[in-house]
C-alpha cells in the first residue's frame, strides 16, 4: 500500500475477529418470530408489499421460499436488535448469514470507526481505511439514511424497517460505509464503497446472500462447514489506488 490509497474491508472478517458470532440454534423461536417470518415476511412482503414497492425480484423470490428454519434467525433479530429491525423482511440489522459455518451468523462489528483507525495506525502510512456493508444507504429529500444500526457520520443510521420502506421511495446509493479512519464526505465514502463492492461482486466466489451458498459451495445453507468456507478464495478487503492523469 502507498500513501493516498484506500483499504476497503468487508464487515464480516472484522466481526469474526471480535468474536461477534451467534449460534442461532440456541434460540427458541417465539410466536412473534414465527409470525414475522411466515405471515409478515414470506406472505405480506413476498406477495403484497414487495411488489407494490418494487423491491428486487430476487428478494421477492427469496422471501416467498423462506423456510421454517429461519424462525430462529428472526428470534435472534428480535432479541438483539428489537422489533424495528425484525420488521424488515430481509437482511435485518446487517446480520450476515452467508459467511459463517453451520447455524452461526455474524453480527455487525463493534465500533468500526475505531477499528478503521487502529488498522491505519498499524499500516503506518497515510491511507484511508474503510469498513463497509453491502446493505444499502438511501437518499431522499437531500438526506442520506440506512436501516443498519451503524454508519459513518452524515448517514442517519438505525432506521430499521422505516428506513427500508422510505428507501424504496428514494434513491438507492449502494453499499454503506460503517466506519472510516478519516473524516470524509458521505459522497466520497459511498463512491469508494461501491467501487470496492462492484469488484467483489465480479468474483465467482462472491456470496451476496445466504441463497448464494449452494451455487458457490455446492452445499445447502444449513450444511456450511468451516472446511467448505476454506475451500474457496475469499476477498475480504480491496485496495484502491488513485490514478492521476
Q: What residue spans do the PLM features occupy?
A:
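Disulfide-rich extracellular domains of secreted proteins
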Residues: 1-3, 14, 30, 37-38, ...
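Flexible, glycine/charged-enriched surface loops at secondary-structure junctions
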Residues: 2-5, 123-134, 193-235
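N-terminal low-complexity or amphipathic/hydrophobic leaders
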Residues: 2-30
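Active-site cofactor/substrate anionic-group-binding motifs, chiefly glycine-
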Residues: 20-58
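Composition-driven recognition of glycine/serine/threonine/acidic- and proline-rich low-complexity segments
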Residues: 25-34, 77, 132-163
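Internal, conserved structured core segments that host functional sites
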Residues: 52-125
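A two-mode feature
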Residues: 157, 161-222
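Conserved small/polar residues in nucleotide/adenosyl-binding loops
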Residues: 243-245
Amino acid at each position: 500500500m502507498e500513501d493516498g490509497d484506500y483499504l476497503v474491508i468487508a464487515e464480516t472478517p472484522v466481526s469474526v475477529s471480535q468474536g461477534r458470532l451467534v449460534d442461532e440454534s440456541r434460540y427458541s423461536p417465539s410466536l412473534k418470530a414465527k409470525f414475522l417470518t411466515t405471515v409478515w415476511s414470506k406472505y405480506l412482503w413476498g406477495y403484497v408489499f414487495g411488489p407494490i414497492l418494487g423491491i428486487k425480484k430476487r428478494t421477492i423470490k427469496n422471501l416467498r421460499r423462506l423456510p421454517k428454519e429461519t424462525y430462529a434467525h428472526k428470534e435472534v433479530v428480535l432479541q438483539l436488535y428489537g422489533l424495528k429491525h425484525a420488521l424488515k423482511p430481509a437482511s435485518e440489522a446487517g446480520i450476515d448469514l452467508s459467511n459463517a459455518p453451520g447455524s452461526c451468523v455474524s453480527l455487525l462489528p463493534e465500533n468500526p470507526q475505531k477499528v478503521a483507525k487502529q488498522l491505519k495506525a498499524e499500516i503506518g502510512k497515510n491511507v484511508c481505511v474503510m469498513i463497509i456493508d453491502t446493505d444499502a444507504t438511501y437518499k431522499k429529500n437531500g438526506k442520506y439514511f440506512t436501516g443498519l444500526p451503524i454508519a459513518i457520520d452524515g448517514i442517519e443510521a438505525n432506521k430499521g424497517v422505516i428506513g427500508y420502506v422510505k428507501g424504496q421511495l428514494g434513491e438507492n446509493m449502494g453499499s454503506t460505509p460503517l466506519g472510516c479512519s478519516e473524516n470524509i464526505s458521505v459522497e466520497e465514502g459511498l463512491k469508494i464503497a461501491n467501487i470496492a463492492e462492484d469488484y467483489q461482486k465480479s468474483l465467482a466466489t462472491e456470496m451476496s446472500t445466504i441463497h448464494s451458498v449452494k451455487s458457490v459451495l455446492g452445499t445447502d445453507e444449513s450444511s456450511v462447514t468451516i472446511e467448505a468456507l476454506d475451500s474457496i478464495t475469499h476477498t475480504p478487503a480491496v485496495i484502491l489506488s488513485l490514478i492521476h492523469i
